[in-house]
Amino acid sequence: MRTKAIIGKASMDRLAFAMVFLLVGLEGQAATPADEKKIEGEIDMRMNSPIAGVNFRMIETNGISMRIAEAGSDGPLVLLVHGWPESWYSWRHQIAALAAAGYRVVAPDMRGYGSTTAPASAEEYDIVTIAADLIGLLDALGEEKAVMVGHDWGSIVAWQTVLFHPSRFSALVAMSVPYGGRPERSPMVEWREAYGDNFYYILYHNEPG
């Protein structure tokens, strides 16, 4: 989960992914600065638009300010952890459905994403630190336990956080990325061997800048 080490790269990647899906009508033409500005404005508008029953606030946790979207009140807490390159907005439909089912639902912008603090140093994005962000979030919310739900890279964060702090979670849901245990060889080594000089997004995002 190496993001915004990065700050400029993460922002441009988010924009690039949006272009792939929103500028299909350009039929291969290069996006202009005006196109980029329009898309970035659309992304910001969607991520900050009011949604019925969903409230936003900043939580101080583990030395950062974390923006959360929350809904519901009295039920068990469900913590929704997004992947890359995403934000709380990826969970907008699930937030409403879970709240309607009686759960308290919280979907944070993870460290380095959205409106949450983005430390400049890559060393501040290790899994132990990210897990501590979520435990600090539970503490700030006054919750002893939660159901952890992760998607994509958020699934990796979800597994590790639950492994580090099993007493704080009653259940774990990992979407898109299954738990594979500890590998015998570093995945980075295997990916470098497999892809060589060819583009692979995980290798690309291990290059600071």
Predicted regions and their residues:
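Bacterial N-terminal signal peptides
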Residues: 16-27
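Bacterial N-terminal signal peptides that target proteins for export
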Residues: 2-16
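Flexible "cap/lid" subdomain of the alpha/beta-hydrolase fold that forms the substrate-access gate
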Residues: 35-55, 64-66, 106, 113-149, ...
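Conserved HGGG/HGGXW glycine-rich cap/lid loop of the alpha/beta-hydrolase fold
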Residues: 70-117
